[in-house]
Amino acid sequence: MADYNLVGVIKVMPTDPDVNLDELEEKLKAVIPEKFGLAKVEREPIAFGLVALKFYVLGRDEEGYSYDEVADLFRQVENVESAEVETVSRI
């Protein structure tokens, strides 16, 4: 694993509760640029059966690493209603 020193949490909301979260998670993992790492993915129940995916994305505190870039890529995936960077922290 590369020497990452940041973790960004990106919360992804699916378009509706009937979206297959396993398939959506795999599609989202596939669009993360290679320079980033992935620590884990959590599922967060929201309401009325809707579940958000929280991606813990690893990066570096240097030019070329933008969590907004990753969120923008997530928003382009089918069945994604929204993707927002919640936090970025040093590790």
Curated annotation (Swiss-Prot):
Species the sequence originates in: Thermococcus onnurineus (strain NA1)
InterPro entries noted in UniProt: eEF-1beta-like_sf (IPR036219), EF1B_bsu/dsu_GNE (IPR014038), Transl_elong_EF1B/ribsomal_bS6 (IPR014717), Transl_elong_EF1B_B_arc (IPR004542)
Cited Gene3D superfamilies: 3.30.70.60
CDD domains named in the record: EF1B (cd00292)
Molecular function terms from GO: translation elongation factor activity
Biological role stated in the UniProt entry: Promotes the exchange of GDP for GTP in EF-1-alpha/GDP, thus allowing the regeneration of EF-1-alpha/GTP that could then be used to form the ternary complex EF-1-alpha/GTP/AAtRNA.
Protein name: Elongation factor 1-beta
SUPFAM superfamilies: eEF-1beta-like
Keyword Protein biosynthesis: yes
Assigned protein family: Belongs to the EF-1-beta/EF-1-delta family.
Origin: domain of life: Archaea
Alphabetic keyword roster: Elongation factor, Protein biosynthesis
Species classification: Archaea, Methanobacteriati, Methanobacteriota, Thermococci, Thermococcales
